[in-house]
Amino acid sequence: MRYLACLFALLLTALPAAAQDKKEVDLALALAIDISGSIDPEEARLQREGYVIAFRDPVIVKAITGGPNGRIAVAYFEWSDSWNQKLLIDWTLLDSETSIAAFADKLSNSPITIARRTSISGAIRYAVSLFARSGYEADRKVLDISGDGSNNDGMLVTDARTEALQQRIAINGLPIINDRPNPFGFPAEADLDQYYLHCVTGGPRSFVEVAKSFDDFPRAVRKKLLQEVADRGPRRGPTDAAALPLADGTRLAQARRPHDNGDEDYTRFVRPGYEPGCDVGERRSREFWQRRFGTTPD
């Protein structure tokens, strides 16, 4: 028996430090927020405030600390062009009211910037690398993308989605139906919720929560976060989020559904069939630039 104990101790010391130090969390959640040119400074502020308010919500705090491990890890970045992702808050352990409040305060105090194009695919690929170095052992890895337009820069969004799903990263979406005038003159995308549903989201129990306007964003963020933290998305495939009792964060966290089989192929959990095609953003962009300037963007 003593020999086995010594052998076990030697095996532990032989493990890489990263493998020993990884802390178990109920959820590793990457929040990806659109700051492309279609978002004006006021809209960017409303998005930021939506997340700050949500993380200060007592119900969400209880949901975060009420799961099996009582903690989650969160990273927050903003994105625009395929090459432009800005990490505002790196992976942070949220395991108490104090740590959650500090996260919200740091987010509130971060500067707000606006960039140019819309590369959902760039955001997804950036998130894949972000998860690879998270330093946490998570029951679930979830990327949440919010935005007010379809992909028009970088690789096809469906190809980037496949890369993420192959790494067992589920993708949820928070499309913002924006009826405000676009500063570049691009037309509004009334079917953006369907684009996100069919072309962006994927993975077991992935879902879309629609913000009907930027003013509606705080409500949508709160509902989305509660469902993600409590693992209460639909069981099979992506769909619109079901109406849930969201008043008791602790009860939601404790009522989470059983996890899917570890061998589950995440790439099976997508919904094809978006009639305009998942390259619609790229085509709209080319048509717009050709019509307005007689050329296509670089």
What do these predicted regions represent?
Residues 23-88, 98-146, 173-184, 191, ...:
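Von Willebrand factor
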Residues 32-42, 74, 90-91, 106-117, ...:
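Second-shell loop/turn segments in exported
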Residues 33-36, 127, 139-153, 160, ...:
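DG-centered beta-turn motif at the end of beta-strands
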Residues 67-106, 183-196:
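Short beta-strand-loop
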